[in-house]
């Protein structure tokens, strides 16, 4: 039996794309900082002149699937990370946005074979979102770790 796993020690060879939503950028900018911190600590060049990391900004989480699809189809990335924050309001808009963005992102990943890490927070309150993107527990770090693992796993499977 062969056991195949992603390796965190092979991160420096990955080309990663991040698609981040501007809506609720108080949250998404913190998630992005967590991602960049993790990627840097794992040997990925995150400087302005980096050829290993590209960041695309979209208006909101609803637009994440389209830009993810374009990036995945470009053939330049081994893995993508999507970042967004959808906070429940008084209307059903929350359900529409999160349902369509999650289905769209999953569909793009399956269609293209490029792993896409789903880093879209879905919370009832801004406070809950801040707690998930804060200093003590920034899920952006976790999303970057998942990206490293999946990117290296997919390379190992090919």
Curated annotation (Swiss-Prot):
Reaction(s) the record says it catalyses: (2S)-2-hydroxy-3-oxobutyl phosphate + 5-amino-6-(D-ribitylamino)uracil = 6,7-dimethyl-8-(1-D-ribityl)lumazine + phosphate + 2 H2O + H(+)
MF (Gene Ontology): 6,7-dimethyl-8-ribityllumazine synthase activity
GO CC aspect terms: cytosol; riboflavin synthase complex
Keyword Lipid metabolism (UniProt): no
EC number: 2.5.1.78
One Pfam family recorded for the sequence: DMRL_synthase
Classification via NCBIfam families: lumazine-synth (TIGR00114)
Family: Belongs to the DMRL synthase family.
Official protein name in the record: 6,7-dimethyl-8-ribityllumazine synthase
UniProt gene name: ribH
